[in-house]
Design a protein with these regions (language model features):
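Cell-wall polysaccharide-cleaving catalytic domain and substrate-binding groove, primarily
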Residues: 1-171
């Protein structure tokens, strides 16, 4: 079964590591380790960051816990057989939301696309040919990113980064 720690380490690199930053035009506003204050204002880590305690082990624990509870657990990551499939869905869920990532996976494997992981989706994922799933899911992600840019032209500046992130996930 897939391992959260391995998936987390790969994802946190994609998110730029444990850094506080704000990118012009990013709808999430200020972020720390990929956690957007605008979308997650009640995350406990903001208290430590606002107090200037960005080197604490507690902050690192809160980051890991955030990603495990809000993304990995929602996609039943520990029950996905192939590490690469779990990592691909997990990384996209961090970028696009857990429901959207699961819905895209459901479309790829042919289960009802309701955005919630369930026994039928899990079974289909675990029976999927790993390489085929990864390629189809990558194409679905790129399509999703293009749709975002078509709806909101201000997001075009992020498109190449999103595509590169998707390509990196193929290796």
């Amino acid at each position: 079964m897939a391992d959260f720690s391995a998936a987390f380490e790969r994802m946190i690199q994609n998110e730029g590591g444990y850094k506080l930053h704000k990118v012009s035009g990013d709808r999430g506003g200020q972020t720390y380790a990929g956690i957007a204050r605008k979308f997650h204002p009640d995350w406990e880590g903001w208290k430590l960051i606002d107090a200037g305690d960005m080197e604490s082990l507690e902050l690192s624990r809160l980051v890991r816990s955030f990603y495990k509870e809000r993304f990995w657990d929602k996609m039943w990551g520990d029950r996905v057989a192939a590490q690469s499939i779990a990592e691909s869905i997990f990384d996209f869920s961090v970028n696009a939301g857990a429901s959207i990532a699961v819905k895209l996976a459901q479309l790829v494997v042919g289960t009802v696309p309701d955005g919630r992981m369930g026994p039928k989706t899990l079974e289909a994922l675990n029976q999927a040919e790993e390489g085929v799933f990864i390629l189809k899911y990558a194409l679905a992600k790129v399509t999703r990113y293009a749709e975002i840019c078509n709806r909101d032209r201000s997001q075009v500046k992020f498109l190449l980064g999103w595509i590169n992130r998707t390509i990196k996930g193929l290796s």
